Amino acid sequence: SHNHYDHLDINSLVKISKKNPDAQFLVPQGDKKILTKRGIENVSEFLWWENSIVKNLKMTFTPVQHWSARGLGDRNKSLWGGWFFETTELNLFHAGDTGYSNDFIMTKEKLGAPEYALIPIGAYSPEWFMAENHVNPEDALQIAIDLDAKKSIGMHWGTFILTDEAVTEPPQLLQSALKERGLPKDYFVTLKPGDYELINN
């Protein structure tokens, strides 16, 4: 989704590439060199709204509100975004990191509503500093509504301590937001490590 170290771990990608030499890597415009410098081939860069089709899977790179950098001199020299995955069976949206914006309304208008959406819910405190680039759980719920996703799964919480909120706070605030809006608990869920969500059509 973007080149921040907690989202683009080059050592993990090198291992994936070695175990799967035919793997194709889709990255935002400007990030290909990060992979090719480490010997990873089959890398394609994408601008917003560009897509690729592999077998029966169509992947479209979508705009979100965030930023990029891996060092001091490369801020916003590459893109950031979400990915919209389409198959004949279902559509899934992965938001990457994002602040709240109208990008999600545009994504729904251009690509349709996803059955599933993976939306970040953590790393938002203090909000005066983080809100532009990281949604809080209430804004994450609004993204799910903007996308008209049938079901959403909260991500980007409980793994790395990046900001000031308690590790357990994002799911609690999400449940409060669902209750406040009169939405069922299973409309937008969170999973603990080892949990899974069965995806069926």
Located regions from the model:
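Helix-loop-beta element that forms the nucleotide-linked donor phosphate-binding surface
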Residues: L35-L47
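Generic structural signal for residues in well-ordered beta-strands
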Residues: V43, M59, Y187-F188
